Amino acid sequence: WIMGHMVNSIAQIDEFVKLGANSTETDVSFDKQANPEYTYHGTPCDCGRDCLHWENFNDFPKGLRKATTPGDSKYREKLILVVFDLKTGSLYDNQAYDAGTKLAKNLLEHYWNNGNNGGRAYIVLSIPNLNHYKLIEGFKETLKKEGHEDLLEKVGHDFSGNDDIPDVEKAYKKAGVTGHVWQSDGITNCLLRGLSRVKLAVANRDSGNEFINKVYYWTVDKRSTTRDSLDAGVDGIMTNYPDVIADVLNEAAYKKKFRVATYDDNPWETFKP
């Protein structure tokens, strides 16, 4: 999965897919009542990027829906996975459940079109704080109440705070999550970070006793870091330059071992070579 980083305006969806992304990441900010408000990152952000692209949250999922609904003029077949980077740092811990409820209602209406030929992409809810695990409960229970439990087949999870892997596992146990787990690791491209925790996550994924199904590393903009990430065995790479990742995947050393994921590849299944 080549994951386009910080895709916060509708126009950027196309821009990143054209560069080779089959997945995008979008920042979601919340208002004081725990409603998703904007797709917005703000300053500071990654080096070399404009941090200020944004949409109202109600509008972004509609644009995303068009890009991921077969038959729509804006449809982009390659775009199969979307990570919502939920900026819950502005919320109190006790608002996490409400945030999940409100996010579910919003996506149900504006992205899934109330279950009537909505967008087809898989969605990862990425939460920065383990204490906000109730967001997952709020999201799931809302879709069930609204009669759309089937859509949970399209929803996965990530805790993005670079916490110790056993602590992440505990948070999932509290939330009742038993699958559909992506594990991120990384840091802004302005700083360096080694791959030691990525390797621990990959080891869990491949242990046969795993709670992690997929591992992705962010933010990777250089060919050398891309090669190191692939050598470590990641499933996804989040990047500001999807074309760089696509180029490296075409190198002789990687061409036979890796390919770009398609819609038929289940993002919740651990890959077994």
Curated annotation (Swiss-Prot):
Give the cofactor note: Binds 1 Mg(2+) ion per subunit.
Amino-acid positions noted as binding Mg(2+) in the UniProt annotation, renumbered to this chain: 25, 27, 85
Q: What keywords appear on the UniProt entry? A: Cytolysis, Dermonecrotic toxin, Disulfide bond, Hemolysis, Lipid degradation, Lipid metabolism, Lyase, Magnesium, Metal-binding, Secreted, Toxin
Top-rank taxon, per record = Eukaryota
**Localization per Swiss-Prot or TrEMBL:** Secreted
* GO terms for biological process, alphabetical: killing of cells of another organism; lipid catabolic process
Instruction: Give, as one word, the top-level EC class.
Output: lyase
> What's the catalysed reaction?
an N-(acyl)-sphingosylphosphocholine = an N-(acyl)-sphingosyl-1,3-cyclic phosphate + choline; an N-(acyl)-sphingosylphosphoethanolamine = an N-(acyl)-sphingosyl-1,3-cyclic phosphate + ethanolamine; a 1-acyl-sn-glycero-3-phosphocholine = a 1-acyl-sn-glycero-2,3-cyclic phosphate + choline; a 1-acyl-sn-glycero-3-phosphoethanolamine = a 1-acyl-sn-glycero-2,3-cyclic phosphate + ethanolamine
Which residues catalyse the reaction? 5, 41
Cofactors, names only:
Mg(2+)
* Enzyme Commission (EC) number: 4.6.1.-
Question: Which tissues show it?
Answer: Expressed by the venom gland.
Any one GO CC term of this protein is: extracellular region
According to the UniProt entry, its GO molecular function terms are:
lyase activity; metal ion binding; phosphoric diester hydrolase activity; toxin activity
Task of the protein: Dermonecrotic toxins cleave the phosphodiester linkage between the phosphate and headgroup of certain phospholipids (sphingolipid and lysolipid substrates), forming an alcohol (often choline) and a cyclic phosphate. This toxin acts on sphingomyelin (SM). It may also act on ceramide phosphoethanolamine (CPE), lysophosphatidylcholine (LPC) and lysophosphatidylethanolamine (LPE), but not on lysophosphatidylserine (LPS), and lysophosphatidylglycerol (LPG). It acts by transphosphatidylation, releasing exclusively cyclic phosphate products as second products.
To which protein family does this belong?
A: Belongs to the arthropod phospholipase D family. Class II subfamily.
Q: What is this protein called?
A: Dermonecrotic toxin LruSicTox-alphaIC1a
Annotated source species:
Loxosceles rufescens (Mediterranean recluse spider)
